[in-house]
A protein has these predicted regions:
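RNA pseudouridine synthases
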Residues: 1-196
Length: 196
């Protein structure tokens, strides 16, 4: 974005000009960035009305019994630890509605590979929602078990698909990002161990 200096007013905040949305630290994958204010405003509007298509791939602890489902719980800052997010009552101060749909891609006994589709985009949404069901993400040192898998580069969460209407042309744009090597290697290892 350096070459766009002077064309971005910092709609999302002075320290993040052009950034339409964020992904969690240690999450890999696709991110929407605008190169000018008009694009930023149009893309931010799509984000606010939840019309941007976002699918994440994740590996969760445990065996999810159903082939698909959803988590619909309000999220906000954890009152005991303000650095974390938590499921809150819908009338709690700062609580925001959040919806995560999920579908099982593969099962490996003690782990399940899932696709998560977001209707909302709250901080740590997938991580907190899945942890609230008893299936935190593999490698998640914040919301997962204390003995999380240290060999992973953070949680197994990847922004795989991203789709939106181009702000100038009106054309639907869809992108797909391959899994990063550490994530793909972990899936390969789980497949081998599960077959053994």
């Amino acid at each position: 974005l350096y070459h766009c200096a002077g064309q971005l007013s910092g709609i999302g905040g002075a320290i993040r000009p052009g950034i339409v949305h964020r992904i969690d630290k240690d999450t890999s994958g696709l991110l929407v960035v605008a190169k000018n204010d008009a694009a930023h405003q149009a893309l931010s509007e799509q984000m606010s009305v939840h019309s941007i298509h976002r699918v994440y791939h994740a590996v969760a602890y445990g065996n999810l019994k159903d082939d698909e489902g959803f988590v619909e719980k309000w999220l906000g800052r954890d009152p005991r630890d303000r650095k974390k997010m938590a499921v809150l009552a819908d009338n709690a101060v700062g609580a925001k509605y959040a919806y995560t749909g999920w579908q099982v891609l593969e099962r490996y006994g003690n782990f399940t590979y899932i696709a998560c589709k977001l209707k909302t985009g709250r901080t740590h949404q997938i991580r907190v929602h899945m942890a609230s069901t008893g299936h935190p993400l593999a490698g998640d040192a914040v919301y997962g078990p204390k003995n999380c898998i240290k060999s992973l580069n953070g949680q197994c969460l990847h922004a795989k698909e991203l789709g939106f209407v181009h702000p100038r042309t009106g054309e639907w744009m869809q992108f797909d990002s391959p899994l990063p090597p550490y994530f793909a290697d972990f899936i390969t290892r789980l497949r081998k161990e599960h077959r053994a």
